[in-house]
């Protein structure tokens, strides 16, 4: 974890770094790319919130905020249905409250975020646009649209098998992934078994949580080991998935698997850098579900003794993937 440090100065006791690039990182301000964010209402009601003033609600139970306040010391997703219902409600309210362009810009400003990966357009220059597949279209039309999106500036592909109701092992997913994989562009997907709607919701059957199971992502990586694939949330938010993901990566010798830090504490972030490699870890928050501030603090704590590695995780690794 301290690869870049070459020793300590004879008189100063300060870390000594080998290259001018490494020295320069010590002198510059913190650079941050948030590799996992959302703008607008991503759920089935699709409320028109992006260009409206930020909404505010009376205080409500918010497990996302509680988790951040506790420094991500436990899993986000539990098997307790009552707790899951509270989480689902909070996720919808946070989307409406913090998912507008105005609220997003405020969060970027307050947390000094240089860029954030999201699905939308270039109206905010700090938002780096990814696109997603329109699985309603026939495969040839879907692929043609994705190619047009790339020409218009899409820097990668985002998949959400639960909310899109299409597993990662579906032929339509393969077709979309191949468009980006063959061009060397990154492909990220939600991973994790979690409900987005409470029991009885008319939308719950349209968002099967089992499509977030890790084995779907592992099958996709095995099919396309040469593509840049990024399992979000380090495989999931139940607390154990990142270890299973890392075991598979090492067992098969997959060289192009990256992952992100969303909802992970400093200890787990250090583990992720060791398990996947310091060049394969991307800072991410899953904003607006996380408020950014505590995620930044956790990442700073994780790599406080290695500013070069901190810059890689916060900025450099993502910048290389996105050709910035």
What positions do the PLM features span?
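Conserved, mostly hydrophobic/aromatic
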Residues: 36, 108, 157, 180, ...
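Catalytic pocket-lining loop regions of alpha/beta-barrel enzymes
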Residues: 155-156, 169-282
